[in-house]
Amino acid sequence: MVRKPVVSTISKGGYLQGNVNGRLPSLGNKEPPGQEKVQLKRKVTLLRGVSIIIGTIIGAGIFISPKGVLQNTGSVGMSLTIWTVCGVLSLFGALSYAELGTTIKKSGGHYTYILEVFGPLPAFVRVWVELLIIRPAATAVISLAFGRYILEPFFIQCEIPELAIKLITAVGITVVMVLNSMSVSWSARIQIFLTFCKLTAILIIIVPGVMQLIKGQTQNFKDAFSGRDSSITRLPLAFYYGMYAYAGWFYLNFVTEEVENPEKTIPLAICISMAIVTIGYVLTNVAYFTTINAEELLLSNAVAVTFSERLLGNFSLAVPIFVALSCFGSMNGGVFAVSRLFYVASREGHLPEILSMIHVRKHTPLPAVIVLHPLTMIMLFSGDLDSLLNFLSFARWLFIGLAVAGLIYLRYKCPDMHRPFKVPLFIPALFSFTCLFMVALSLYSDPFSTGIGSVITLTGVPAYYLFIIWDKKPRWFRIMSEKITRTLQIILEVVPEEDKL
């Protein structure tokens, strides 16, 4: 099922085109670097796919403050139950995306699936709010955690200056952008290494926890389902925190066109990753409770540090480094995946054409990567990022739910579509209901923030009609746009992709 772009995304004469040697015609007469076509290569193997999913799901939260679930359940047993249920439901969502990714073999994730099923307007609104607010703010938040924890070993006895955190954060963001601009292979290799660091950090917590259980340290699990008074009405909020902790399983679908043998790799990578993350999350929480009781966990600002100080002695000094590496992995994986979302949206005519162009030698979507840098820097040095993300958290579940509902629609509308991987219908149905529940919960628990988020999201509607539908733009605007694009092509050494889908 292939759509035509909403508008023409690549000029037939106005913009510079790459030649068969993979170079811009205006870059001189040097010997061409090779005969490869200018296009994104399929370099994402099974191992790299697993590292993208695990690397973007596991951030700082499980090490620093996994208390949102416990706070709203009131008992150790119920919190572990919620962690398990959320892992299973996230697996259902991931399996639904595996079917979508092997049926619609295009990059872009939920943007592409919404575009294919529901049309250009909701797809544009999705990418509009993602580009301008959600992704820059989310990248800035995880990057600030990286900056704080990479500096913590140097400021053990005093408070870390806020300016120092932001400066080292800015350096980290720049390194990630440069890395993703220079090489897909190196970005993927570093992601594998960082994922290994994350899993090592989790094992450093789980193994001593298991040893504590063997020694009989089970006092915090006695009467596991009794504890602080907690209303059953707060369980949905605990569920919300749990689902948020697993978010990230959808990122491999953002890079479908770069996955080797996607019909096999995507489902297998998703199943392996979700099994590892779910087991890791549950066992990490079990390990915490072998040493820290519920009240202490709720009071701790860095649970992994508290745990390691009690069991690992001086080795606890290494925990901030592992947390920083975990954050860096989330930064790298997020930028790698989301840049492909912008690339595909540009190819479909929803973003400026320059974002759908590829570097002539490095074969990376350079403009789609670097566009995030100034936007993230603005967010980094601006106001309250957490509030901004809270305003828009409902939008994530709304659009993911729409994408999975689209799977159900395609089952009935296009029953003969080739589906290499097919899930039982109750899986997408249950997950779509879960997403609807998350949106309803946002409206119920915080109507003010959700209302602000709705207004911000809906600004994409007039933007769609102004920038996409209105085709009688002034001549001076079209000329200026073309000149800017040509200039950026020459500076960045990028051209339209050859043999696009």
UniProtKB/Swiss-Prot annotation:
Positions contributing to L-glutamate binding: R135, Y244
One of the record's GO molecular function terms: cystine:glutamate antiporter activity
Entry-linked InterPro entries: AA/rel_permease1, AminoAcid_Transporter, L_AA_transporter
GO annotations of cellular component type: microvillus membrane; plasma membrane
Membrane-spanning intervals of the chain: 44-64, 75-95, 131-150, 164-179, 194-210, 235-255, 266-286, 318-338, 365-385, 388-408, 423-443, 450-470
Membrane topology recorded in Swiss-Prot or TrEMBL: Multi-pass membrane protein
Topological domains, Extracellular: 65-74, 151-163, 211-234, 287-317, 386-387, 444-449
Sites bearing Phosphoserine, chain numbering: S26
UniProt KW Chaperone keyword: no
Cytoplasmic compartment segments: 1-43, 96-101, 117-130, 180-193, 256-265, 339-364, 409-422, 471-501
UniProt feature: intramembrane region: 102-116
Compartments in which it is found: Cell membrane; Cell projection, Microvillus membrane
Glycan attachment residues as annotated in the record: N314
Catalytic function, reaction form: L-cystine(out) + L-glutamate(in) = L-cystine(in) + L-glutamate(out); an L-alpha-amino acid(in) + L-kynurenine(out) = an L-alpha-amino acid(out) + L-kynurenine(in); N-acetyl-L-cysteine(out) + L-glutamate(in) = N-acetyl-L-cysteine(in) + L-glutamate(out)
One GO term of the biological process aspect: L-kynurenine transmembrane transport
Keywords (A to Z) from UniProt: Amino-acid transport, Cell membrane, Cell projection, Disulfide bond, Glycoprotein, Membrane, Phosphoprotein, Transmembrane, Transmembrane helix, Transport
Subunit-level organization: Disulfide-linked heterodimer with the amino acid transport protein SLC3A2/4F2hc; this interaction mediates cell membrane localization.
NCBIfam families found in the cross-reference section: 2A0308 (TIGR00911)
PANTHER family documented for this protein: AMINO ACID TRANSPORTER, CYSTINE_GLUTAMATE TRANSPORTER
Function: Heterodimer with SLC3A2, that functions as an antiporter by mediating the exchange of extracellular anionic L-cystine and intracellular L-glutamate across the cellular plasma membrane. Provides L-cystine for the maintenance of the redox balance between extracellular L-cystine and L-cysteine and for the maintenance of the intracellular levels of glutathione that is essential for cells protection from oxidative stress.
UniProt similarity note: Belongs to the amino acid-polyamine-organocation (APC) superfamily. L-type amino acid transporter (LAT) (TC 2.A.3.8) family.
The protein, known as: Cystine/glutamate transporter
Protein source organism: Pongo abelii (Sumatran orangutan)
Lineage of the organism: Eukaryota, Metazoa, Chordata, Craniata, Vertebrata
